[in-house]
Amino acid sequence: MKWTAFFVCLGIFFDFFDGLLARKLNVQTALGLQLDSLADMVTSGVVPGLVLFHLLGLASPPSWETTGLLPYFGLLVTLASAYRLANFNVSTEQSDAFIGLPTPANTLLIISLPLLLEYQNSAAVTTIILNPWFLVGLTVLSCYLLNAPVKLIALKFKTWDFKTNANRYLLIILS
């Protein structure tokens, strides 16, 4: 799972900088936007859904194994991510801010869970993360936040000027 997290973080890193570079070089195209969203769909849509699928499989009580349907609930994040990315592509309101949680932010939250399981030694944390109700709740919350009508700051730098990007720099420093 650590390699999954590594490659997802690498994909998110390149996703951030390819858009920045395209804007800086003024080479943005409609095809580029679609290809960017397709790459986002894999790194920030399919992967978190599969991670939740895996965690829900681990968390399923033995009595639920007969149906085996609970893990599939995690794939709702993939569908919500696809809807969010499609909505982003056609929206004219998201050039300076995001409406709803960006898919990479949601992905970073979800891929942190298996890493916590692997690298911490707290039985309480393991119990919480592998609680099926926690994972179902997280899935529902993620699906909602991805498409919530809430404006969030975007880390889209048009210039490196501190004055116009003070909020962005502050967010990065505080993170």
Task: Show where each model-derived region lies.
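C-terminal membrane-associated helical module and adjoining short loops/tails
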Residues: 98-175
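Membrane-embedded helix-turn/re-entrant segments that form the catalytic/gating core
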Residues: 61-69, 73-95
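Alpha-helical transmembrane segments
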Residues: 3-4, 38, 42, 69-76, ...
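Membrane-embedded alpha-helical segments that form the functional core of polytopic membrane enzymes
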Residues: 1-34, 69-78, 138
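Alpha-helical transmembrane segments and their lipid-water interface positions
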Residues: 18-22, 43-50
